[in-house]
Amino acid sequence: MFHLHVNLKYFLYPAPMDMRKSFYTLSGIVTSVMKRDVQNGEVFIFVNRRLTIMKILHLEHGGLVIYHKKLESGVFKLPTFDEELTSQVIQWHDLMMIVRNVKPKKRLLKKR
């Protein structure tokens, strides 16, 4: 059923996504904007403007799957990335921290 794991490649779409979009529109964005192929088994992550809803698009055996998470409170804490990019590569561990709503660690700066 849930076939996401550490050996897959994960791509975060940097722009806010309208969460009314589903399989066809998200697949179109993967192809036309992100310049990736949804059929190759990679995982594509979309988040809404308010950072309260996430959709994960992935091809599994038998067809496309969308995992959909809506937070009851709080917001997803995304890593910082260059907004000029069409997609941001993230690691499995980072995705799990985002889904569990744990802020990715930042480098601590020492006071001078």
Regions found by a protein language model. Give the residues of each.
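Polybasic/polar functional segments that serve as interface/processing modules
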Residues: M1-R112
